[in-house]
């Protein structure tokens, strides 16, 4: 779910309504192209040194590199017995994996992409797991409804990031947690940090994970390239490779050169 050159162009144009419309159409387009039972993760990959070597079911093994990012982000806190909301759940692979392995009391995946939610409901049928369509900047839940709000590689798509953060604060219970991972170009880092610091949430941890994401992309690159080439028409393959994370793309080079910063955070609501 990484941003492409569209992100920079729209940011310079300064039109949040245009920005939101582009993402509103882009993700359903990718779901129609990539949306089948084989492609349940659309986040970039992640691997540590030494490798994480998570014990996975055979059906999860093809998605190990994507699961690593979800696992490392989510396990900054204990999800066991918690009511969890994932904002921007994509194709639901992370929601399914975390529900099956970390045993939350309930797990709700929310996404603006109606086609993606339809795919999630069809593909991931588990006790305690639900999917709803909704806007990250206007969450359809009561105040203090969740113990954990998770967000993985998505908030760069939100035209009003502070509104999203305000919604996280609103729906989190006191003592709740916000494990979070995303990326920004260097010229947006100061604003990103300022927005995060302006919330009443208390930061527990923060680290840059460029090296781990690049390692994961490298390990997973051929698989991702093959998926794009197999499922997308030729005119969308360039954008598809940037979107899903393939070694040698412009965005991976920016990540390697330090022009992008990919970070993992954890916050709590006191």
From Swiss-Prot:
Gene3D superfamilies, sorted: Vaccinia Virus protein VP39 (3.40.50.150)
One term under GO cellular component: plasma membrane
SUPFAM superfamilies on file: S-adenosyl-L-methionine-dependent methyltransferases
Entry GO MF terms: methyltransferase activity; O-methyltransferase activity; S-adenosylmethionine-dependent methyltransferase activity
GO BP: DIM/DIP cell wall layer assembly; lipid metabolic process; methylation
Enzyme Commission no: 2.1.1.-
InterPro entries assigned: Methyltransf_11, Methyltransf_Superfamily, PthPhpthDimycoMt, SAM-dependent_MTases_sf
Keyword Thylakoid: no
Short name of one Pfam family: Methyltransf_11
Keywords of this entry: Lipid biosynthesis, Lipid metabolism, Methyltransferase, Transferase
Family per similarity comment: Belongs to the methyltransferase superfamily. Phthiotriol/phenolphthiotriol dimycocerosates methyltransferase family.
Annotated function: Catalyzes the methylation of the lipid moiety of the intermediate compounds phthiotriol and glycosylated phenolphthiotriol dimycoserosates to form phthiocerol dimycocerosates (DIM A) and glycosylated phenolphthiocerol dimycocerosates (PGL).
Other remarks on this protein: Was identified as a high-confidence drug target.
Protein name per its UniProtKB record: Phthiotriol/phenolphthiotriol dimycocerosates methyltransferase
């Amino acid at each position: 779910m990484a941003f492409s050159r569209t992100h920079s162009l729209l940011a310079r144009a300064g039109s949040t309504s245009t920005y939101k419309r582009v993402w509103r159409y882009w993700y359903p387009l990718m779901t129609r192209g990539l949306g089948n039972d084989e492609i349940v993760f659309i986040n970039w990959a992640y691997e540590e040194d030494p490798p994480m070597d998570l014990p996975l079911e055979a059906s999860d093994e093809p998605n190990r590199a994507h699961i690593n990012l979800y696992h490392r982000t989510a396990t900054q806190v204990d999800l066991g017995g918690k009511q969890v909301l994932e904002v921007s759940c994509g194709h639901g692979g992370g929601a399914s994996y975390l529900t099956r392995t970390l045993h939350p009391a309930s797990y709700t995946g929310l996404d603006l992409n109606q086609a993606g939610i339809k795919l999630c409901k069809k593909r991931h049928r588990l006790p305690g797991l639900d999917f709803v369509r909704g806007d990250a900047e206007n969450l359809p839940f009561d105040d203090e409804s969740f113990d954990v709000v998770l967000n993985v590689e998505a908030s760069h798509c939100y035209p009003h990031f502070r509104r999203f953060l305000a919604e996280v604060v609103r729906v989190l219970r006191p003592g709740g947690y916000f494990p979070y991972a995303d990326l920004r170009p260097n010229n947006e880092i100061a604003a990103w940090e300022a927005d995060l610091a302006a919330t009443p949430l208390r930061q527990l941890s923060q680290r840059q994970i460029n090296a781990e994401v690049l390692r994961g992309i490298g390990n997973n690159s051929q698989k991702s390239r093959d998926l794009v080439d197999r499922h997308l028409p030729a005119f969308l393959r360039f954008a598809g490779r940037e979107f899903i994370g393939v070694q040698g793309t412009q965005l991976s080079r920016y990540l390697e050169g330090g022009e992008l910063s990919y970070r993992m955070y954890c916050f709590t609501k006191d």
